[in-house]
């Protein structure tokens, strides 16, 4: 029997743009370093100093009242203060935290120099019946892994995109929670289903995008994730 909650406002999907650059880079030298990193699997001499290697991490970026990024905390739980605070066009809200991906130089155990920072789209698992629509257009799946903190489940996607005009249309995504089951011993398992609308976007080329799933405060012991891909439904258990 339903409990009456069906009368609450239906949920919409989250928009994600895949052709527009969302990374903020800080210097030409940093950009060249970033390009070198992306083209080389083992770019650096392992004999270099402990803090000389550029690193890349998913993080929570803390922004102050002036929309300046001051600190970030990685998925491994390490917190750093930026040697030089910065802002960016995509930082639109003051006094908040952004889910981000960051390339940085570790200056000390508590400080870091930002090289390139961008936003990561975050979705929450929502009961399936709360969505206005539940599209499952195929999407490329690359990887899924749990953040060490246990707060996020990160998913790597390959999204097909293109343009038929100057207008840039977004893909629409969401995460439907189909079931939550509690075993007699108290363990909990949740089944999540990835929602995706191609939104009529031409499929001319492929872009890699990452999405973070913000897990409930009381986290399931086991997560079953299903994604409709071009090769059929992929099931991942984490």
Which residue ranges define each predicted feature?
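C-terminal motif of bacterial Sec signal peptides marking the signal peptidase cleavage site
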Residues: 35-38
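Structural detector for short beta-strands of small beta-barrel domains
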Residues: 43-67
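Beta-strand/loop nucleic-acid-binding surfaces
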Residues: 77-92
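Flexible glycine-rich surface loops and low-complexity tracts that mediate binding to linear polymers
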Residues: 91-113
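Short, solvent-exposed, Trp/other aromatic-anchored flexible loops in extracytoplasmic proteins
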Residues: 95, 194-222
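OB-fold/S1-family single-stranded nucleic acid-binding modules
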Residues: 106-130
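Short acidic/polar inter-strand loop motif in beta-rich domains
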Residues: 108-111, 220, 228-236
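Short helix-loop boundary/capping segments
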Residues: 142-195
